[in-house]
């Protein structure tokens, strides 16, 4: 199989990379009705599989789970989760032939085997659904021409998909139809109904393409969402300890600092995050972020280039074929780092303390978010897609570190994201070591003293922060979410 993106000509590549439209609430007036009375069979019962299934069932759809024979016979975790939640469970042979929509929610590396198993069993004219387009775009999976291929990609972990639905809301979602597989022209109707059934239409849906979703998703998770947080955690911890900070305090400042800092990001973008700092600290954070952007820009561009060309995917798939040797080695090495093995700090750190003593961390967040966004947009990805794959998801990933450090982040994210994270962080840590050696007192671990600032400089920095394109599109999209939540909660 050939990488699908690389089979397209340049005009087709640009058209698919640039496909992104924020859909109006009125486009979902029919809710999930297009799929009501039809049989939806989900393959895989992990975080996305279970939680999407729960939402879809609560939205009135007929949901069952197709699992491998051995998973059922051995009563594995997937079987237990599905049966304990009252779902019908059967083998591929028992359930797939009757399915109107088969939703493949297994890990990326299993997709080819799953499709190879289910495709011969699918009835003529059925639909195949994904929540990530890697198998179609990067692997180049060929699907029977009578089958409609759609994607519904919630921009959150599966647990959040469920919790937001239970609150009467949803999570922002990308939907797409594979242009090579829409024989009856019903792909968009299926995708809209599926998105509505998960609650995504209440938070905002972007009509996208398989290509745009995959390329932007890979870029976000490799750089700012996971790679930058891992590299930043390791670098900042080592710097604090090197300067005499108690390792337990240093660990807590970083572990919970990312979550605290990005909560401000979630509520009001980079502008609010920077506004949490004193004026002298804001000026310093801005200066540090500009230095970081200059240093890291080539690394971000290399990751984007390798994602666009397919170099990243081919390297990762070679590691799949080698029993994940690189992935497992990197995972083990990360678990042995000083940050991961540091003792826990029993004392309390106040919320503002995380900002005051984390100026460098704030600079890293700002630089990483802006660089990821800029690099995606420069590559033809539309701003709304770039926002969701950079700033929007960052607080969710930071929350995983707050639970159990980098271990938890790497457990929760996909193997694809984890592999890309290690590629980035292993390059970024040595790249930034000279920069770390030049830090000033107050950049990390100590607060910058209050003092006079130049009004004109502060004015210009504030303007630069607020006028960045990600702040403009972020304000618009957060406004949509707030408005939609208000409408949804009001009934």
From Swiss-Prot:
- Domain KARI C-terminal knotted, by residue range, is 209-344, 345-484
The reaction(s) this protein catalyses: (2R)-2,3-dihydroxy-3-methylbutanoate + NADP(+) = (2S)-2-acetolactate + NADPH + H(+); (2R,3R)-2,3-dihydroxy-3-methylpentanoate + NADP(+) = (S)-2-ethyl-2-hydroxy-3-oxobutanoate + NADPH + H(+)
**Key word Ligase present in the record?**
no
- Give the SUPFAM superfamilies listed for this entry: 6-phosphogluconate dehydrogenase C-terminal domain-like, NAD(P)-binding Rossmann-fold domains
Q: Which UniProt keywords apply?
A: Amino-acid biosynthesis, Branched-chain amino acid biosynthesis, Magnesium, Metal-binding, NADP, Oxidoreductase, Repeat
Q: What Enzyme Commission number(s) appear in the record?
A: 1.1.1.86
Q: Which domain of life is it from?
A: Bacteria
Could you give a GO molecular-function term held by this entry?
A: ketol-acid reductoisomerase activity
Locate the residues binding Mg(2+) 1: 217, 221
Q: Which Pfam families match?
A: KARI_C, KARI_N
| PROSITE patterns, alphabetized | KARI_C, KARI_N
Cofactor mode of binding and number, as noted: Binds 2 magnesium ions per subunit.
Q: Which cysteines are joined by disulfide bonds?
A: none
A Gene Ontology biological process noted in the UniProt record is: isoleucine biosynthetic process
Query: Which GO CC annotations does the UniProt entry carry?
Result: cytosol
Detail which positions bind NADP(+). Answer: 45-48, 68, 76, 78, 108-110, 158
Q: Which residues bind substrate?
A: 414
Enumerate the InterPro entries for this protein: 6-PGluconate_DH-like_C_sf, 6PGD_dom2, KARI, KARI_C, KARI_N, NAD(P)-bd_dom_sf
Q: What class of enzyme is it?
A: oxidoreductase
Transmembrane spans: none
What does UniProt list as catalytic? 132
Chain residues that bind Mg(2+) 2:
217, 389, 393
State the protein's purpose.
Involved in the biosynthesis of branched-chain amino acids (BCAA). Catalyzes an alkyl-migration followed by a ketol-acid reduction of (S)-2-acetolactate (S2AL) to yield (R)-2,3-dihydroxy-isovalerate. In the isomerase reaction, S2AL is rearranged via a Mg-dependent methyl migration to produce 3-hydroxy-3-methyl-2-ketobutyrate (HMKB). In the reductase reaction, this 2-ketoacid undergoes a metal-dependent reduction by NADPH to yield (R)-2,3-dihydroxy-isovalerate.
Instruction: Please give the family membership noted in the entry.
Output: Belongs to the ketol-acid reductoisomerase family.
Protein name as catalogued: Ketol-acid reductoisomerase (NADP(+))
